[in-house]
């Protein structure tokens, strides 16, 4: 009898060995024959510094090689290195490289530096491969001994003193030109927030002094002078320090304060209009309120949206932060494609009454002040826009149908200026089907939906707070949706959803609160689902129908990591349903009562050409109604699912879990799994392969770890409940790789993943057995309703749009 195990193992071993050999070699193409060429360069930094500082310096110093010593290296398939047209080695380039590197190190505060080069030439056939190693020995880094701000203007000096806690120039901190430049930039920003409109970086100067103050003491003894000089030299060698003084340059125009004047809006400006011409033009509709004026030729926009999103109040000091906040707020309304701003400097007068006395009459003092008028030229976006999108997704390896192909079409109609209030309206009509490629009846799922959203650029509430001015953006959102979904032979689901909520943003923090979310569902159970209920009674608890009246709160934020190449994303969501209405008797047996929370953390570490991405997700939902009519678990449309192109990619969509239960895997009917708890971790290493025309081709190596579970104990499906003594057994692990085709506007992703640890695998505690490797799980045979043997693959192919996370 033919045994496929041994050839499979040999093939797998051969593939691994071939990949190792393929990755370990560096190929040189179009090299100069019989001449030494630059094959490799490297930098080694030694000194009393931290590992992170050593790594930073070595990475940055790579940019300071002379051009003729740089290696023209290309990475193929993420693992193979190719050098094309290498430079002929030129020994004179060593000196220029040392000069460049020394200048960079000086700018970082390292002055006592020794650089030595080592040259090795290896002969490979007719190749003279030259390796250049630069050894860098660092002395002690300069540290800041003192910091002083010496501004002649009392106003500038007061601003700096009031904010000196924010400075990074602290005593004992390492000195570098970069930290000085950063401090000057912060001061410019600080001054421009306090009225100094014309001030820029060139108007400030930082004086760095390394003089030992003890040398300034007067002494007539030449031996004492020699001793002081020797001691000062030794102190500089052991502990080199600098004194930093920041002051203004000798200019006057930049240090004049400016105040906010008038604001003018031109909401119908065209892209080719000249701003100076528009400012001189007469308009049919001119509306003024306070210091703000809107100029239009025809009714286009009401004044209120412009006024509410402008943060420039007349008479206040010019504040660059509030200026940019205004520009961003108007841009985010969505009614205009482009916003251009012109400022005009004017001089105004202030009359101050000076009271007199019995001997001197009262006087009026006239002072001149500088003011700024702002002219906003807003180019409208196309009011109506219609678009259509085609979505395609595929996941293979499913137990039920072999291969599933999803196709959906979205038609979107947008109105960017409803009722001339800058209200954004979006209507989406979606129709989709799910096809089985290995079934006599290909159509498995049909879905049709209609949704409409109104986004109003203000917070509609019975009260108003001045705190709203502190927000960067805010809006009220109304949403309505109706959908129909039919799973062949299993169910027909109809739903109507309506919600009202508020969304606001402060810096990188975004909040979304929905005080009212109403969801109505009706479910028709067909014969396939009825049969599944008979074999798996636990499914009934999830497929009961009821109403959802809930409120939700979602928070998400992005923030930088401890290093500049690290970015983080956090999302937390809480939903509560039926808390108060559930006490009303008329809602018994109709209303779901539950609380559901979920959290997500993502981190991206970007390197020169590659990236490392992590994702951690956890969610739990608890049904506290204990009403048998609406079930003891979350409704299935609120439960968690795993598998598919964006979650646990070694499993098809909704085909992982629950826990290590085999109920769904051994069933010949309904295979979808829904859980009250989900835990998942994803790790992905992304790297480029090639660029063909304008299409960037990349790849990734990834692993997915997680599962879904029931929260409450189910007698008929005990292994579906999360328990700590079975937690390790329940965890699923998949590994894989894939291709990504980046077309700039969208990304198409093909992923292949293998089940390294499958909770539904009985043998070896779920782990794959390398010595008994199989592409399919043959532990037990399952026949479908047509009598054919159903396949349980240990792998899955996924087709997705965009990155998985």
Model regions and ranges:
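C-terminal outer-membrane beta-barrel translocator/porin domains of Gram-negative envelope proteins
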Residues: 393-401, 414, 512-697, 701-726, ...
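Beta-rich nucleic-acid/ligand-interaction surfaces
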Residues: 121-128, 206-224, 324, 344-374, ...
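Conserved active-site loop/cleft motifs that coordinate metal ions or position small ligands
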Residues: 700-702, 747-753
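Bacterial N-terminal signal peptides that target proteins for export
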Residues: 2-13
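C-terminal motif of bacterial Sec signal peptides marking the signal peptidase cleavage site
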Residues: 21-24
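Gram-negative/organellar outer-membrane beta-barrel architecture
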Residues: 156-160, 299-300, 316-571, 604, ...
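Interaction-mediating elements
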Residues: 2, 26-332
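Flexible glycine-/small-residue-rich
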Residues: 47, 134-140, 151-153, 244-248, ...
């Amino acid at each position: 009898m033919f045994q496929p195990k041994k050839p499979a193992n040999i093939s797998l071993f051969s593939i691994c060995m071939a990949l190792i050999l393929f990755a370990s070699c560096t190929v040189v193409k179009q090299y100069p024959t019989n001449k030494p060429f630059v094959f490799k360069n490297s930098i080694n930094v030694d000194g009393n510094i931290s590992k992170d500082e050593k790594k930073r310096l070595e990475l940055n110093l790579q940019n300071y090689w002379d051009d003729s010593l740089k290696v023209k290296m290309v990475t193929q398939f993420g693992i193979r290195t190719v050098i094309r047209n290498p430079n002929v080695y030129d020994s004179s380039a060593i000196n220029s490289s040392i000069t460049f590197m020394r200048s960079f190190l000086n700018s970082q505060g390292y002055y006592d530096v020794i650089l030595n080069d080592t040259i090795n030439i290896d002969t490979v056939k007719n190749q003279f491969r030259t390796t250049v190693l630069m050894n860098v020995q660092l002395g002690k880094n300069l540290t800041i001994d003192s910091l002083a701000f010496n501004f002649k203007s009392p106003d500038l000096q007061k601003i700096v003193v009031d904010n000196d806690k924010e400075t990074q120039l602290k005593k004992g901190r390492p000195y570098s030109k970069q930290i000085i430049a950063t401090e000057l930039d912060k001061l410019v920003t600080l001054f421009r927030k306090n009225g100094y409109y014309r001030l820029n970086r060139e108007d400030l100067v930082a004086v760095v002094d390394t003089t030992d103050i003890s040398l300034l003491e007067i002494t007539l003894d030449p031996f004492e002078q020699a001793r002081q000089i020797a001691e000062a030299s030794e102190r500089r060698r052991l502990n080199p320090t600098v004194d930093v003084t920041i002051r203004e340059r000798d200019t006057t125009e930049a240090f004049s304060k400016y105040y906010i004047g008038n604001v003018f809006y031109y909401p119908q400006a065209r892209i080719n209009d000249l701003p100076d011409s528009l400012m001189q033009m007469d308009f049919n509709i001119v509306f003024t309120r306070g210091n703000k004026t809107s100029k239009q030729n025809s009714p286009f926009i009401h004044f209120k949206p412009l006024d509410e999103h402008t943060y420039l109040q007349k008479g206040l000091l010019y504040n660059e932060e509030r200026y940019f906040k205004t520009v961003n707020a108007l841009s985010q309304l969505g009614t205009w494609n482009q916003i251009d701003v012109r400022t005009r400097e004017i001089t105004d007068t202030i009359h101050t009454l000076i009271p007199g006395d019995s001997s001197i009459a009262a006087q009026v003092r006239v002072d001149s002040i500088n003011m700024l008028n702002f002219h906003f030229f807003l180019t409208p976006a196309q009011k109506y826009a219609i678009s259509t999108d085609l979505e395609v997704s595929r996941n293979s390896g499913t137990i039920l149908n072999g291969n599933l192909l999803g196709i959906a079409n979205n038609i979107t109609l947008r109105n960017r200026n409803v009722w001339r209030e800058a209200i954004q309206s979006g209507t989406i009509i979606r129709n989709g089907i799910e096809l089985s490629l290995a079934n006599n009846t290909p159509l498995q799922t049909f879905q049709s939906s209609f949704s409409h959203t109104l986004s109003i650029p203000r917070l509609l509430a019975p009260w108003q707070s001045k705190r709203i001015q502190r927000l960067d953006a805010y809006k009220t959102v109304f949403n309505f949706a109706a959908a129909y979904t039919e799973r062949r032979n299993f169910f027909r689901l109809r739903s109507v959803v309506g919600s009202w909520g508020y969304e606001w943003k402060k810096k990188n923090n975004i909040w979304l609160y929905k005080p009212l979310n109403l969801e109505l569902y009706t479910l028709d159970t067909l014969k396939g689902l009825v049969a599944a209920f008979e074999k798996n009674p636990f499914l009934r608890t999830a497929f009961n129908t009821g109403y959802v009246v809930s409120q939700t709160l979602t928070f998400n934020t992005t923030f930088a990591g401890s290093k500049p190449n690290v970015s983080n994303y956090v999302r937390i969501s809480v939903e509560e349903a039926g808390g108060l209405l559930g006490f009303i008797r008329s809602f018994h047996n109709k209303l779901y009562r539950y609380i559901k929370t979920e959290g997500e953390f993502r981190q991206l570490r970007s390197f020169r050409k590659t990236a490392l991405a992590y994702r951690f997700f956890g969610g739990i939902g608890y049904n506290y109604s204990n009403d048998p009519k609406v079930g003891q678990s979350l409704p299935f449309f609120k439960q968690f699912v795993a598998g598919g192109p964006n979650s646990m990619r070694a499993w098809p969509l909704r085909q992982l879990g629950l826990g290590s239960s085999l109920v769904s895997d051994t069933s010949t009917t309904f295979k979808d799994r829904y859980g009250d708890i989900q835990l998942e971790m994803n790790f992905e290493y992304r790297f480029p392969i090639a660029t063909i025309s304008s299409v960037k081709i990349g790849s990734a190596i990834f692993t997915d770890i997680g599962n879904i579970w029931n929260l409450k104990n189910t007698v008929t499906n005990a292994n579906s409940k999360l328990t700590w003594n079975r937690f390790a057994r329940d965890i699923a692990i998949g590994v894989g790789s894939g291709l990504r085709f980046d077309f700039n506007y969208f990304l198409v992703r093909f992923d292949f993943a293998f089940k390294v640890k499958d909770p539904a695998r009985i043998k070896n505690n779920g782990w794959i057995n390398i010595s008994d490797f199989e592409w399919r799980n043959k532990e037990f045979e399952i026949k479908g309703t047509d009598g054919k043997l159903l396949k349980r693959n240990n792998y899955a192919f996924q087709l997705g749009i965009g990155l998985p996370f």
